[in-house]
């Protein structure tokens, strides 16, 4: 199993934008077959060094992660939206 984590710092991190981004990220559930589990959390502390949203995706293998990265729904809907509303993102991928 592989865990894929992405943290996003939104250009405008008001409550509405955070909720909308969370909804877009969670919309992958059931639409991206290689994503076995998806969890999205919104930062509550709001410190200057905090990122606003964290996405966690669980996939079966490194090959499945590659398929996830290239999935049409992930690329055309989710990535497109998140790139439009984010000023920065970081990711971390590791085996379990």
Residue locations for each model-derived region?
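Short S/T/G/P-rich N-terminal loop/turn motif that feeds into the first structured element of a domain
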Residues: 1-52, 60-70, 93-96
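A common structural junction motif
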Residues: 27-32, 73-78, 85
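Charge-dense polyanion-binding interfaces
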Residues: 80-96
């Amino acid at each position: 199993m592989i865990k894929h984590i992405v943290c996003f710092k939104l250009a405008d991190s008001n409550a509405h934008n955070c909720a909308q981004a969370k909804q877009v990220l969670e919309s992958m559930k059931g639409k991206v077959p290689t994503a076995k589990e998806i969890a999205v959390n919104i930062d509550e502390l709001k410190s200057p060094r905090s990122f606003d949203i964290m996405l966690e995706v669980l996939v079966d293998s490194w090959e499945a992660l590659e398929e996830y990265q290239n999935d049409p729904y992930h690329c055309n809907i989710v990535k497109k939206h998140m790139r439009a509303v984010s000023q920065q993102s970081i990711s971390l991928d590791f085996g379990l």
